[in-house]
Amino acid sequence: MIVLGLTGSIGMGKTTAAGMFAEAGVPVYSADDAVHRLYSGRAAPLIEATFPGTVENGIVNREKLFKAVIGQPEAIKKLEAVVHPLVREEEDAFRREAEKSGAAIALVDIPLLFETGAEKRVDKVVVVSAPADIQHTRVLARPGMTQEKLKAILVRQIPDAEKRSRADFVLDTSGSFDDLRRQIAEIITGLSGKPAAATR
């Protein structure tokens, strides 16, 4: 089984691309989805112990947690020390299931793939990319997003140009959905030797 690592800076279309891989029949693991599950499950008491007042009714309040760690590298390290091992456990379970299902390709969607060294655990890296103006427009259209938040997020992410230079495949997400589907189908066919499943 070939494991693809999908990554890209915020607002580059990672979630959309991951959804299209899934539509094409590729098992997909999302680190972000895992974090959401963990924040309302077993990570919540650990986060409350580390950052008191950030959990309400057993669920991590993401806004409060963001305020507790923004601009504080040591606090971010503490949070990562709690969350990353749990996310990794979920990823390992996903890989076992995908392998058992006989999948030729599986995809792990990890926003901080390079930043956390996770590229060492995948066979090929796929980076989603779009021009900076499109990226900023997409991100600032999100509810609750501000220029300050965007800057804080981008500071922690390796620049897009470097990600592209380290990728095995680059998906240009600035065009139409059909164009993106075509790019994804080419990757799947090239790696598996079989046409991608129907994406509609």
UniProtKB/Swiss-Prot annotation:
Pfam assignment, any one: CoaE
Keywords for this protein: ATP-binding, Coenzyme A biosynthesis, Cytoplasm, Kinase, Nucleotide-binding, Transferase
The protein's role, per its UniProt record: Catalyzes the phosphorylation of the 3'-hydroxyl group of dephosphocoenzyme A to form coenzyme A.
Enzyme category, top tier: transferase
Compartments it resides in: Cytoplasm
Species assigned in the record: Brucella melitensis biotype 1 (strain ATCC 23456 / CCUG 17765 / NCTC 10094 / 16M)
Coiled coil: none
Gene (name only): coaE
Annotated GO biological process: coenzyme A biosynthetic process
EC number: 2.7.1.24
Recorded catalytic activity of this chain's protein: 3'-dephospho-CoA + ATP = ADP + CoA + H(+)
Similarity-based family: Belongs to the CoaE family.
Name by which UniProt lists this protein: Dephospho-CoA kinase
GO annotation, cellular component aspect: cytoplasm
GO MF, any single term: ATP binding
Binding residue positions for ATP: G11, M12, G13, K14, T15, T16
Pathways per UniProt: Cofactor biosynthesis; coenzyme A biosynthesis; CoA from (R)-pantothenate: step 5/5
Matching NCBIfam families: dephospho-CoA kinase (TIGR00152)
PANTHER family in the cross-refs: BIFUNCTIONAL COENZYME A SYNTHASE-RELATED, DEPHOSPHO-COA KINASE-RELATED
Keyword Chloroplast annotated: no
Residue ranges of every copy of the DPCK domain listed in the record: 3-200
